[in-house]
Amino acid sequence: MSDYEEDTRPPPNIETADPEDTIKILLATDNHIGYLERDPIRGQDSINTFREILQLAVKNEVDFILLAGDLFHENKPSRDCLYQTLALLREYTLGDKPIQVELLSDPDEGKAAGFSFPAINYEDPNFNISIPVFSIHGNHDDPQGPGVNGALCALDVLSVSGLLNYMGKFDLPTSDADAATTGIAVRPVLLRKGSTKLGMYGVGNVKDQRMHFELRSNRVRMYMPKDKDEWFNILLVHQNRVKHGPQEYVPEGMFDDSVDLVVWGHEHDCRIIPEPVAGKNYYITQPGSSVATSLADGEAIEKHVALLEIKGKEFQLTPIPLRTVRPFVISEVVLEDAAEEEGLDVNDQMEITKYLKQKVNDLIDQAQALWEERNARSIEAGDEEIPPMLPLVRLKVDTTNVTQTSNPIRFGQEFQGRVANPRDLLVFHRSKKAGKRGAGKVDIDQPELSIDDPDLTVSEKLAKVRVKTLVREYLAAQELQLLGENGMSDAIQMFVEKDDIHAIQTHVNKSLKTMLKNIKSDEVDEDDLDDLLAKAKQRQEEEYLEATRAGESAKGKGKAKATDDDGGAASDDSMLMDIDTGGGATFNMSDDDDDDEPPPPPKRRAATSRATTTKKAPAKAPAKKATTTTARGRGKKAAPPSSDDEVIELDDDEDEISEEEVVAKPVKRTSRAAVLSQSQAPAKKAPAKKKTPARQTQTQLSFAPAGRSSRAAASKARSKMVFDDDDDDDD
């Protein structure tokens, strides 16, 4: 709530009433005429309530009606909507009743350009106005469109017809140069009745960011008479009162101290009792809408208009409930709580439907009781009884941890003829925040991150921000059961930093596929499945960490290298594979690799020698056999987390090949190794590669000194070629 609630000032009141000096005003806002006008049930709700407001003005013999925006729901009201509005204004605002408020300001201020009639309708001798209506525009009926006469709105039409006085319209600067020096100029409508002087300052709806800027910059200029302390000043605004963003609202304490009362439009919940503002002399009244345009909690508050009486610098406000507003009740149920408290079976859809029907029936009975109570008050006050109306009912259903739910539209069909909104009777939703699992555990949605340390300065926090670190901490809070946190972290980093859109999907698919293969081969019982998965995940994590640190894991050496670009044991080869633009040596991604631990010295530079070693002629035949073992090793090693999607694709193909089948084709594999070993740089163009053409491009990345056995070197060169080619395919 706002700070004004701390103000202990008593409600405003007029000590001695004097009709000759008291200005009586009927306050209303957000009528939204035309809302759901095509709905067969609710189509006439807004116009019926507007008719009641005009009738209340006549009944209470007010001096005029004051509206704070959104008279129409649509920016371009329909012909039928305009017809009914004009007819009602003519019916209730024209007549022989004399106007007792004197206009002191210029009657031509704001009049239609090029015409002689005044802006204030009761100053026109051709009209016989009994109750003037003053209104500003809202965000629904604001001026739009360029034209000869500038931007126009529906209120301009009512104004030139002589049935309404449009105020609060101003032109904003059209150029940046003018915007720097020109603000919002608010010119008042000055009225007097007896000894009471009233100044009305209307500010039609402006985008909240712009209004916030103008107020912060003190660029809202209110033109006031010289003896401003003798005037009672009312300010009409139509802006966000609730904070929706840093600048998407208007602070309550931003208005001038000379204002006595702020009439706030746009907010639909009724807070019509004047509320003081801490540190300010003025009060705020928020009449709220006269028709429910959304089935929200704020709309369920009883709708009111107000009778405002002003004498000198004193005022008092009397709320008047609206009888023609359709009754609206709203409630919420949590199925999970109902299961605990009432024994509801959340797995039985029929039982859930029966439970929800009972809740809706209770709400209908509640709405009926509300309607009867309202009618009883009206009859006591001497008003006519209003025929019953179908109520608006909204039941919000929290379906967290519930899988069986009803169809909302089909559910509402059973209440056809009993409620006014059968199609949106139910609204299903789930809780956004998960409950705490216990003390000491990290919250899933808001884990304790290392950058949240209160002892760190802003610069230190920014310096510690790393994708790898943040992802790892979030994944730790999720408590993954199948995927390893390290491998998933690397896959996400590949996705973020290197635009590898398939990294995450490929890593997940590969890990799950390998795990399923292991489970099928072991043929374990379902009771032991969780333990097996936990052990498999732990084994994957251990192998992954070992591979990333050593870079020479016997089973998944190439795969570990391909995904190890996060620092730690990352080698120069891994940088080449990750970028893959032909000039891998020119890339330096180590800036992002300083997250958690400093990388060890580049002792594995010898790894680049593996491809060069393939030049040796005796290494051809052994290279084929070594390659076969390496391929199968990569297939089994697919379970450790990885971010190299192409490697997974190649491994999937090789996993289906048995060892005997691979050995049965030693000649072709040996010939490819020979071609690669004899022509390193030109091998990129070698067309002889038909089965795995991507491997041909690896020759340009094959460079290293000799110093290892031809068998091992050829095997590692082959493994290195596969992963480098995968990066090429990804680009």
From Swiss-Prot:
The keyword Metal-binding applies. CDD domains: MPP_Mre11_N. Residues 543-731 are annotated as: Disordered. Residues 608-632 have a biased composition (Low complexity). It holds the Pfam family Mre11_DNA_bind. The keyword Ion transport does not apply. Mn(2+) 2 binds at D70, N139, H238, H266. Keywords: Chromosome, DNA damage, DNA repair, Endonuclease, Exonuclease, Hydrolase, Manganese, Meiosis, Metal-binding, Nuclease, Nucleus, Telomere. Belongs to the MRE11/RAD32 family. This is Double-strand break repair protein MRE11. It comes from Coprinopsis cinerea (strain Okayama-7 / 130 / ATCC MYA-4618 / FGSC 9003). The lineage of its organism: Eukaryota, Fungi, Dikarya, Basidiomycota, Agaricomycotina.
